[in-house]
């Protein structure tokens, strides 16, 4: 084995170890915690830790509601990837965080396993975010102003420990993916069975070996391609105060 091959083998094993550790933590929570709500919260926190460790500091990750300037609000989302530097969260109360829709890059649901019901549920959660109104304003620079940009499509996915189908992420799984535009799942990871994404249009599936790191690196590439979120029209949010005064 050459030195280069040895280095690659070491790196490959390190990536596998990260996946094994997360899988063990989730398995331990599932076997030692009886209350389903508490179990879900612990597993959700494990996924949040992984995302915080591997995403660059320009991104913030949290469980949150997503809101818009028209008063719309999403379902509670297990894991929201949003802009860290340019967009403050609003109305934070303890663990209840509210993130402006314009700040959101991606949303994920954390579930015990992949099955038809959870895929549908994740799609509905994604739609509750994608249907929100997003503003965009011009950005001033030394030579004038950049025109307002159209918001990019928000990425949506699902995170689980395993697939409930015997063959993992197979044709049966694919046939149960949501098909409505607002409910589409762009990516997902089932630790013990593999990962998938359609960032380039065609659905790509990865087996269990290195699935977690493969998923994270593919997600990093997708987030990188989105660039920066649009500049928020804060006056639209300020107008909420006047709108409520006019109500009888």
Enumerate the predicted regions with their spans.
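Intrinsically disordered, low-complexity Ser/Thr/Pro/Gly-rich regulatory segments
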Residues: 1-76, 81-248
């Amino acid at each position: 084995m050459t030195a280069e091959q040895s280095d690659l083998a070491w790196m490959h094993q390190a990536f596998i170890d990260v996946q094994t550790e997360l899988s063990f933590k989730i398995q331990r929570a599932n076997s030692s915690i009886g209350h389903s709500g508490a179990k879900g919260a612990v597993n959700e926190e494990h996924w949040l830790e992984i995302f915080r460790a591997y995403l660059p500091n320009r991104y913030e990750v949290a469980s949150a509601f997503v809101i818009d300037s028209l008063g719309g609000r999403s379902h509670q989302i297990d894991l929201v990837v949003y802009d860290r530097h340019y967009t403050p969260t609003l109305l934070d109360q303890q663990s209840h965080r509210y993130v402006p829709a314009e700040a959101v890059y991606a949303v994920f649901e954390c579930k015990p396993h992949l099955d038809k019901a959870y895929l549908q549920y994740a799609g509905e959660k994604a739609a509750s975010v994608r249907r929100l109104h997003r503003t965009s304003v011009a950005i001033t620079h030394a030579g004038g102003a950049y025109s307002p940009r159209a918001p990019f499509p928000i990425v949506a996915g699902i995170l689980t420990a395993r697939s409930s189908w015997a063959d993992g992420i197979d044709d049966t799984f694919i046939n149960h993916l949501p098909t409505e535009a607002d409910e589409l799942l762009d990516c997902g990871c089932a630790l013990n069975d593999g990962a998938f994404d359609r960032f380039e249009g065609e659905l790509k599936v990865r087996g269990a070996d290195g699935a977690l790191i493969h998923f994270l690196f593919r997600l990093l590439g997708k987030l990188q391609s989105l660039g920066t979120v649009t500049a928020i029209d804060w006056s639209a949010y300020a107008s909420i105060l006047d709108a409520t005064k006019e109500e009888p």
